[in-house]
Amino acid sequence: MSQRIAILPEIITNKIAAGEVVERPASVIKELIENSLDAGATDISVEIAAGGRRLIRITDNGHGMSREDALLSLERHATSKIRSDNDLDGIHTLGFRGEALPSVASVSRLRLSSRETDSPEGTEIIVEGGKVRDVRACGMAPGTVISVEQIFFNTPARLKFLRSAETEAGHVGDCLTRMAISRPDVAFSCSSDGRDLLRVQRGDLLRRLSQALGKGTAASLHELHLSRDGIDISGYISSPAACRSTTSAMFTYINGRFIRDKVIQHAIMQAYRGVMDRGRYPVVALFIQLPPAEVDVNVHPTKHEVRFRRQSLVHDTLQSALEELLKRSPWLPRPQTPVQPAAVGAPSISQAYRERVAAAAQASLAMARKPDPPRFHETARPQPDPRHTPGTESVSVREAPTPFLPREPAADPQGYFSALRIIGQFHDEYILCQSGDQLVIIDQHAASERVAFQKLRHQFDTDGVESQRLLFPETLELSFSEADTARRFGNELARIGFELEPFGGNTVIVSAIPRLAIARDASGLIRDLLAELTQLGASSAFLDSRDALLSRIACHSVVRGVHRLEERQIRELLHGMDGTDFAASCPHGRPVSHVITLGELERIFKRT
C-alpha cells in the first residue's frame, strides 16, 4: 500500500533548496558576495580553509542589518528586494529570492554578525543545521561578517561529492574572478589557508582585467562600445592571436550578472569565425545592459542561465558589435605602416585572413632563400591593392602552380607519403599530391603536428622531453588560478620540458621550454597547458593525460594557418609522416589527408 501524502518539515525543505543553490563552497561564496554587493559594499574580504570545506568567512562594509532584519534573513523567502510579482519584471539586484542564507545555514554551522552604520552595536546569530542556537549583541565595525563552518556536516551524501581542497579552492578563485571583473569599483581579497589567492583594488575595468588576468592578457584587449535598439554593449575583447584553448576566459554579464548562455556564446563565436582557428576561444569581458523586462533571470537556481524576450535581437546586436570591431583589426599596423605581404607573389586576401597573414609574415621572410632545386615554379600572382578598404576586399583565386618534375626514384623502398608526387600548395595551407589516379590533399598543419607529437612522445618515453634554456628568460604574469595550477603541477611541467620559477605574486619566470617549441609563443603555450592541466585534474592522473599535454605542445611547435613551404620542406614533412604512428589523423583526431579519385573528379565534371 502506498504511503499517504504529507507536507515535509521545514528543515527538510531547506535542505532540498540547499541542494539547488549550494553545490560546493564556491556557490556559497557566490550567493553571499551577491548579498554583500546588493548591500552596497565597496570592500569584500573572503577567507577559506581546506578549500572552504572547513571554513568560509566573508566580511563586507555594506549597510549591515538590524537585529530584526538579521533574524528575518534566515527565514526562507525573506527578502528586502521585491514586494510583489510585478517586481519580478524589474529586478535590479543580484539576489531576490531570499533562499541563499537559509539554504546555507541548513547544511552548515553558520555565524552571522551584522551592524548598521547608525547602530551602537551589532547582532550575532549562531545557527547549526538550520536551527538558531543563540542571538546576542556584539561589538563590530559597520557591515556584515558571515562565517560558514563544516559545510554539509549533516548531509554526508553531499559531502562525499566535494573534490580535494585544492580543486575546491580553484573553483572559489574562478568564482571570485568573475565577481571581481563584474564590479571594478569594489575591492576584493581572498586568502586560502593563510595564502593570498586574489587581491584587487578599486579602479576601472581595464585595470581590473589586468589585475585578474595578467598584464599580458590585458594588453591584447580592445575596447568595445555599442548602443542600439535599447541594448548597450561595452567591455573588452581580444585579438584572434590571444585566443585560448577553453572558454575559461570568456566573461559575459547581463545587467551586471555573470551568465553562461548559449545564445551569447554563439554570437561571440560567430563574430570570430574566419579569423580564429577552430577549437580556440577569445578572451572577452562583455557587459550587456538591457531593460530588466527584456530578460528573465528567474529560470535557474544559480541564475547563470537567463531567457531573453527578444533572443534574436540580442544575438544579432552582439554579433554585429563584435564584427564591427574585428573588421577594423585594431591589433594590426595602421595605414601609415602597411602590413607587408607574407612573401613575394602572395595573393590578395580578404580582411578575415589579414591577421593570419601578418602573423606568418615574419616567419616566412626569415626563411632561407638558398636555391635548392627543384623549386616551385609558379605563375605571377596579383599583389594586394592598398586602395582596398576593410570589408570590400574580394578573395583572389590562385592560379595553379606549374608542377615540377618528379625526382629520380630512390634506391630504398619508400613509404606511402614519401612516394607521393608533389603537385604544389593550395592557399599555403594544403599540400596537393598525386598517387596514381588519386589526388591526395594534405593538411600541412595537421601533418606537422602529428610528426612533432611523435617526436615528443618518443622523447618523453626515453630520456624526457628535450628542453632548451632561454637566452633571455621571459617574465609571465598569470591569473591567480593559472599561478596556482603552475605551482601544483611544477614537477609535471618539468617532465615535459618547462622550467617555471616563482617570481612573487602570480608572476613566474620561464627559464626553459621544449626545444621543438623554441620558435613559438611560449606564453600562449604555457597558458594553454595550464588550462589543460586544470581540466585534467590531479597530478596522479598525469600519465593518463600525457598525450593531451604533448599534443598541445606539438600544436604550438608547428606552423599554423597560411605558411609557404619549399619543396624540400614538403618532402621532409612527408618523410616524417612515414615514420609516425596513426598518421591518418593529428593528435586531436582531425584528418591529415583526403583522397579524391579520378573517377570522382570525372563525375563532378560529368565526364562519365
Swiss-Prot record:
InterPro entries: DNA_mismatch_repair_CS, DNA_mismatch_repair_MutL, DNA_mismatch_S5_2-like, HATPase_C_sf, MutL/Mlh/PMS, MutL/Mlh/Pms-like, MutL_C, MutL_C_dimsub
GO BP annotation list: mismatch repair
GO molecular function list: ATP binding; ATP hydrolysis activity; ATP-dependent DNA damage sensor activity; mismatched DNA binding
Gene3D superfamilies: 3.30.230.10, Histidine kinase-like ATPase, C-terminal domain (3.30.565.10), MutL, C-terminal domain, dimerisation subdomain (3.30.1540.20), MutL, C-terminal domain, regulatory subdomain (3.30.1370.100)
Domain of life assignment: Bacteria
Biased composition (Basic and acidic residues): 369-390
Keyword field: DNA damage, DNA repair
Transmembrane segments: none
Signal peptide coordinates: none
A Pfam family the protein falls into: MutL_C
Annotated segments matching region Disordered: 363-397
PANTHER family: DNA MISMATCH REPAIR PROTEIN MLH, PMS, MUTL, DNA MISMATCH REPAIR PROTEIN MLH1
Membership in a protein family: Belongs to the DNA mismatch repair MutL/HexB family.
Annotated protein name in UniProt: DNA mismatch repair protein MutL
